Design a protein with these regions (language model features):
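Surface-exposed, charged secondary-structure patches
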Residues: 23, 57-118
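N-terminal signal peptide c-region/cleavage motif recognized by signal peptidases
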Residues: 13-19
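Surface-exposed patches in mature extracellular/periplasmic domains of secreted proteins
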Residues: 43-55
Length: 158
């Protein structure tokens, strides 16, 4: 059941209107869908995904990749994590259920899902690099739990 619901939302997101060109370019919603497909892994349990995965990295902007690499170097020097959760699953222990991905204008997409009874909304902001949409920031949470990947990984944190 879980996998069939995932497949339904993937199909719905792929059919969503977006800023994709006729040349087969992926819209922000389609890029977001592709990231969650990679994260789901072969079992659909979201236990294998991470931002370092070479299949995910290709969807990140050059600027975001550079910022993540710089954060990793600072993290190693400090011998402690700066980014201590996974932004795609908005967790330390991934549990993604009832995933729905939607376009948010032409330059963003949101992934809405549940971890048990907890609803998560993760927003992906995109930039164009050449003719391709790339993820340039990820944010989520609300209230005191609100977070922004760029804010977390920027120099001066930790």
């Amino acid at each position: 059941m879980r996998w069939s619901m995932f497949a339904f939302f993937i199909a719905a997101a792929a059919a969503a209107p977006g800023a994709a060109s006729a040349a087969g370019e992926k819209s922000p919603a389609e890029v977001t869908t592709a990231i969650y497909q990679i994260y789901a892994g072969p079992k659909g349990d979201y236990q294998t995904g991470n931002l370092d995965d070479k299949r995910v990295v290709v969807y990140l902007s050059k600027s975001l990749r550079a910022a993540l690499k710089a954060m990793e170097a600072r993290s190693k020097a400090l011998n402690e994590p700066i980014l201590d959760f996974d932004p795609v699953t908005d967790s330390q222990d991934p549990q993604v259920e009832k995933l729905a991905i939607a376009a948010e204008g032409d330059t963003a997409a949101t992934a809405t899902f549940f971890s048990g009874d907890v609803k998560h909304v993760v927003r992906y902001s995109f930039v164009r690099e050449g003719d391709v949409w790339k993820v340039d920031d990820i944010s989520g949470g609300a209230g005191d739990e609100k977070w922004d990947l760029r804010d977390i990984i920027k120099p001066g944190k930790k």
